[in-house]
């Protein structure tokens, strides 16, 4: 099972290596505005799944939200520690 830290490490590596055809690289290249739109979209999908769908579907939507939030963190140059200071 992948952890939040594992995902952040993987996405950081992808951002540095920029493999051809990577969806993460495409999203990063779209910039903060485009990433922000994905975060908002996924947050709405989490809400709808939590209210109207199965636990498994809600978990899937939450995982997608976490992914896009981490892409935003990388785009802004934020680390897990930067965010952790506010928890």
Curated annotation (Swiss-Prot):
GO terms for cellular component: cytoplasm. The keyword Nucleotide-binding applies. One of its GO terms (molecular function) is phosphoribosyl-ATP diphosphatase activity. It comes from the Bacteria. Gene3D superfamilies: MazG-like. Its main location: cytoplasm. Disulfide bonds: none annotated. PANTHER family: HISTIDINE BIOSYNTHESIS BIFUNCTIONAL PROTEIN (PTHR42945), HISTIDINE BIOSYNTHESIS BIFUNCTIONAL PROTEIN HIS7 (PTHR42945:SF1). Belongs to the PRA-PH family. This is Phosphoribosyl-ATP pyrophosphatase. It comes from Clavibacter michiganensis subsp. michiganensis (strain NCPPB 382). The gene is hisE.
């Amino acid at each position: 099972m992948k952890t939040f830290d594992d995902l952040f490490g993987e996405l950081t590596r992808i951002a540095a290596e920029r493999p051809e055809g990577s969806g993460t690289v495409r999203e990063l290249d779209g910039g903060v505005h485009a990433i922000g739109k994905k975060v908002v979209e996924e947050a709405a999908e989490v809400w709808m799944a939590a209210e109207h769908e199965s636990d498994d579907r809600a978990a899937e939507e939450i995982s997608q939200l976490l992914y896009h939030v981490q892409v935003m963190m990388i785009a802004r140059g934020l680390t897990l520690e930067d965010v952790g200071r506010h928890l």
